C-alpha cells in the first residue's frame, strides 16, 4: 500500500487561514483542500493574496492539494457559461500559485422536478468545454457527486467520467447517502475513475452528517477498497457543526443537516473529531 496523504477542508475549523493552519498542524494533516480563506471564497481572492497564503503554508510545511471550488454549482439553465469558463481559467491561475494539482468542480444544478436526462447533452457539452479550457495546464479537474446536480447519482457520474475523459472523480459517500444512493454500488461503478475521496458520512434516515464510520456511507469498506486500488489522497470534510461558510455551499432553499446526533462545543472540536474518526478507520 502506498503512503496515504491526508488533507482537509480546514475552513470548517476556522474562517481565517492562520486558524486553518493550526487545525491542520495539530491533527497531522499534510495540507488543504482550500475552499475559503479569511472569509473569502478561494476563487475571489487576489493573486497577491494567494501568494501570501502559499508562503504561510510553506512556512509550516503544508501544501494545497486541491482548490475546493464551487465551479458548476450553478443552474444548468442559467445563461452564464462564459463566466464559468472564466472561472476555470482563474482557478487554474490560482492553482499554479498555490501549488494545487486539482480543482474540484460540479455538473450544474438541475431545475427542481425536472428529469435530468433532458439536460444530458447540455451538461456533457459544458463539461467538455470546461475540460478543454484547462487542458495543458497541469491541473486536473475533478468532478464531485453532489445533491441536486446532474452528477448526483452513480450512473450519471459514470456517464460524465466516461464521456469527458479528461475529468477525474471525487467520491463523497455522504452526498451519495443524501441522494438515496447505495455507496458500495456507487464505488463498484466508479472506483477506477476516482482520484481522491472526501471523508464524510451521513444517515439515510434523516440525511444528517455524522463522523466517518458512524453512518450509512460504508466509508470503512470503500476507504479500504480505495487504498487497495492504489488510492493515496483523502480530504476530511467534517460538516459536523455549523461553520461560517456553510450557507455558501448550499443550494438556495436547502439546509444541510449538521450538528444533530453529535454535538461539539466549537468548530475546532468538530474538526478534530472528524480527523479522529478518520484515524480510527485507518487503524
Give the residues covered by each predicted segment.
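A short acidic, helix-capping loop that chelates divalent metal ions and anchors anionic groups
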Residues: 38-41, 73-78, 111-116, 178-179, ...
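Active-site beta-loop-alpha junctions enriched in small/polar residues
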Residues: 9-13, 35-37, 69-72, 108-110, ...
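A generic secondary-structure micro-motif detector
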Residues: 10, 42-43, 81, 120, ...
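Active-site acidic/histidine proton-transfer and metal-coordination neighborhood
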Residues: 16-22, 56-59, 76-169, 178-180, ...
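Glycine-rich, proline-tolerant flexible connector loops at the mouths of alpha/beta enzymes
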Residues: 33-57, 107-114, 207
